[in-house]
C-alpha cells in the first residue's frame, strides 16, 4: 500500500521537555519518594505506562486539586498542560517537592492572563471543557476568565467589562478557533485578539490540511485523550476532505477501514511516541489486500523504547 508520511508529525518540543524532566526525576535519588505525576504528563497511555515502569506513578481524577488530595508525601510533577496557582499553593502547603513540566507555550498564556488582569481586562478563553490546559488557565484568574468551547457558549456569555481580550487553548484546531473568535467579535466588536495556537500544533494541522488531500484515508496515531490528535483527524475530514481514524497504536487499526484504499496518509499527535507511529507505518507499507499474510495486526513496541534517553549526570 502507498503511504504518505505526513511531515511534520509527532513529538513537539514541549512534550519532549516534559518527558525529559520526568525521566531525570526518576533518576534523581535525592528526590523524596514516591514520585507522582499530577494527571498524565502528556496525553499518551504508552508514555504513562513507561514512566510507571520507571517508578513514577500517574494519578488521575476530575481536576488537579482533587488529584492532589491523593498525595500525602513525596514529589509531584506538574504536567505539560500547566496548573493553576491554587494547585501550586496546595502542594506547597502539603510540604511536597514539586517539579514543573509545563509547556513554555502554556506558560505564555498564563502570563498573558496575569498581565491583562492587572490592566482591568476580562478574558474569553476558547478551550475544551474538562481538559487540564483550560483548567489551569482559567485557574490563573477565575473571576475574569470565561471558558467557551462552542459558538453557542459565546452567545450565552454576559460580560459587562469594557476591556476584553480573547485567547485560546494551544492545541485547538486553528479553524475552530477562527470561527469562535469571529462569533466573539460579532458579539463584542471591541474585543482584542490574542491567538495562542502553538506553532507545533499549527504546522502539523497545516501539513494534514494539504498532504492528506492526496490520500484515500488518513490514520492519526494518538491517544484518545490527546486533544491535538483528535483535532488532526478533524482537520483531515473537514479541511482536506479525507476520511480519518485516530488509533492509539497498531492494535486499534481495523482492516475494514483499508477496503478500497490505495493510498493512506499517516500522521501522529504531539504526544505520540515515534516508535508507535513507525510500527503503524511499517504495517501499512507492507499491507497487501490480496495477501492475508500481511494482515497481522500486532503491537510489539516495548515500554523501554518509549521514553527519551537522558544522560546521567555525575
Swiss-Prot record:
Top-rank taxon of the source lineage equals Bacteria
- Keyword Transferase in the entry? The reply is no
The cofactors named for this UniProt entry are:
[4Fe-4S] cluster
Q: Name one GO molecular function term.
A: 4-hydroxy-3-methylbut-2-enyl diphosphate reductase activity
**What positions does the entry give for [4Fe-4S] cluster binding?**
12, 103, 198
User: Can you tell me which residues form the catalytic site?
Assistant: 133 (proton donor)
Q: Name one Pfam family in it.
A: LYTB
| Pathway this chain belongs to | Isoprenoid biosynthesis; dimethylallyl diphosphate biosynthesis; dimethylallyl diphosphate from (2E)-4-hydroxy-3-methylbutenyl diphosphate: step 1/1; Isoprenoid biosynthesis; isopentenyl diphosphate biosynthesis via DXP pathway; isopentenyl diphosphate from 1-deoxy-D-xylulose 5-phosphate: step 6/6
Residues that bind isopentenyl diphosphate, according to the entry? Answer: 43, 81, 131, 226, 228, 271
The Gene Ontology biological process annotation of the record reads: dimethylallyl diphosphate biosynthetic process; isopentenyl diphosphate biosynthetic process, methylerythritol 4-phosphate pathway; terpenoid biosynthetic process
Alphabetized, the UniProt keywords read:
4Fe-4S, Iron, Iron-sulfur, Isoprene biosynthesis, Metal-binding, Oxidoreductase
Q: According to the record, how does the cofactor bind?
A: Binds 1 [4Fe-4S] cluster per subunit.
Which Enzyme Commission number(s) are listed? 1.17.7.4
Q: What is catalyzed by this enzyme?
A: isopentenyl diphosphate + 2 oxidized [2Fe-2S]-[ferredoxin] + H2O = (2E)-4-hydroxy-3-methylbut-2-enyl diphosphate + 2 reduced [2Fe-2S]-[ferredoxin] + 2 H(+); dimethylallyl diphosphate + 2 oxidized [2Fe-2S]-[ferredoxin] + H2O = (2E)-4-hydroxy-3-methylbut-2-enyl diphosphate + 2 reduced [2Fe-2S]-[ferredoxin] + 2 H(+)
Q: Where does (2E)-4-hydroxy-3-methylbut-2-enyl diphosphate bind?
A: 43, 81, 131, 170, 226, 228, 271
* Annotated NCBIfam families: ispH_lytB, PRK01045.1-1
Q: What does this protein do?
A: Catalyzes the conversion of 1-hydroxy-2-methyl-2-(E)-butenyl 4-diphosphate (HMBPP) into a mixture of isopentenyl diphosphate (IPP) and dimethylallyl diphosphate (DMAPP). Acts in the terminal step of the DOXP/MEP pathway for isoprenoid precursor biosynthesis.
The similarity comment for this entry is: Belongs to the IspH family.
Its recorded name reads 4-hydroxy-3-methylbut-2-enyl diphosphate reductase
Name of the gene encoding the protein in the UniProt record: ispH
Amino acid at each position: 500500500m502507498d503511504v504518505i508520511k505526513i511531515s511534520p508529525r509527532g513529538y513537539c518540543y514541549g512534550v519532549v521537555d516534559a518527558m525529559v524532566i520526568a525521566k531525570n526525576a526518576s533518576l534523581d535519588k535525592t528526590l523524596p519518594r514516591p514520585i507522582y505525576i499530577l494527571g498524565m504528563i502528556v496525553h499518551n497511555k504508552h508514555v504513562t505506562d513507561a514512566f510507571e515502569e520507571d517508578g513514577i506513578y500517574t494519578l488521575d481524577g476530575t481536576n488537579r486539586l482533587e488529584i492532589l488530595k491523593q498525595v500525602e508525601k513525596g514529589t509531584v510533577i506538574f504536567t505539560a498542560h500547566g496548573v493553576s496557582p491554587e494547585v501550586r499553593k496546595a502542594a506547597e502547603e502539603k510540604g511536597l517537592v514539586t517539579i514543573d513540566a509545563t509547556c513554555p507555550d502554556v506558560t505564555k498564556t498564563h502570563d498573558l492572563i496575569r498581565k491583562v488582569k492587572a490592566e482591568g481586562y476580562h478574558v474569553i478563553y476558547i478551550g475544551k471543557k474538562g481538559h487540564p490546559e483550560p483548567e489551569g488557565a482559567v485557574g490563573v484568574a477565575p473571576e475574569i476568565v470565561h471558558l467557551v468551547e462552542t459558538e453557542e457558549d459565546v452567545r450565552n456569555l454576559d460580560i459587562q467589562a469594557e476591556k476584553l481580550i480573547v485567547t485560546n487553548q494551544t492545541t485547538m484546531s486553528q479553524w475552530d478557533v477562527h470561527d469562535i473568535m469571529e462569533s466573539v467579535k460579532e458579539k463584542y466588536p471591541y474585543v482584542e485578539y490574542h491567538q495562542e495556537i502553538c506553532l507545533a500544533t499549527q504546522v502539523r494541522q497545516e501539513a494534514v490540511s494539504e498532504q492528506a488531500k492526496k490520500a484515500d484515508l488518513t490514520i492519526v496515531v494518538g491517544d484518545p485523550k490527546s486533544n491535538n490528535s483528535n483535532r488532526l483527524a478533524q482537520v483531515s475530514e473537514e479541511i482536506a476532505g479525507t476520511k480519518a481514524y485516530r488509533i492509539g497504536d497498531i492494535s486499534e487499526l481495523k482492516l475494514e477501514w483499508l477496503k478500497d484504499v490505495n493510498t493512506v496518509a499517516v500522521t501522529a499527535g504531539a504526544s505520540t511516541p515515534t516508535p508507535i507511529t513507525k510500527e503503524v507505518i511499517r504495517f501499512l507499507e507492507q499491507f497487501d489486500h490480496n495477501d492475508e499474510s500481511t494482515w497481522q495486526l500486532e503491537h510489539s513496541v516495548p515500554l523501554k523504547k518509549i521514553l527519551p534517553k537522558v544522560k546521567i549526570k555525575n
